[in-house]
Amino acid sequence: KHFAHFPVVYISGLEVYEYLKAKRTKVKIKHLPLSISDRYMSLFEEQITKDIDIINVGRKNKVMDEYIQQFLLKYPNTNYVHREMENGENIYYSSVHGRLGTLTAREDLLKILSRSKIAIVTSPGLDGGEQRTGGFNPVTPRVFEAAIGKCYMIGKYEKNSEYYSFGLDKLVEMPNSYIEFETIVQDELITPFNRTDDYAAFLKANL
């Protein structure tokens, strides 16, 4: 009812859009998928030294975080960068170098992703996030940012229509156990990035 007087409402999440269409909402809605600006493609073309092993720049998925903590116990020299909330600010830490500080702009976020070999990407409505999202699991901007940074992607997504529409089944490794996670991480940490063509096609299709 809050949007009834709007001429059109754009919905970025395909899952939500399909849900509202099925409910025959009286509001005129259109699907406008997530994308990323082409102004960041210059960063994609750069060759940047990757000195970070694993990065999680956003919220943490409970299961993936448990896998990471297990991995760090076994391989303590792994350089893992992650975000913590402190006094309302996003503060980034490295498991090797300690407190890194804040990232104040999206460009800073993309640059640190470009230094990372593996990025963790997940749906927000899984493993305890269901109440926050109402059970919906949209694809997040992180996959576009990780693609710009040429990071291998490991994560956890609901295999819904949006997941397949973006082709994440071909881009994101989704381990079902810690052993699978460890195997994937070990392989990707020693394998120079080799998915430039796949990522370029993904980004071009979604600019």
PLM regions and their residue ranges:
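Nucleotide-sugar donor-binding catalytic core of glycosyltransferases
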Residues: 2-168
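Pol beta-like nucleotidyltransferase catalytic core
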Residues: 119, 139, 147-148, 152-207
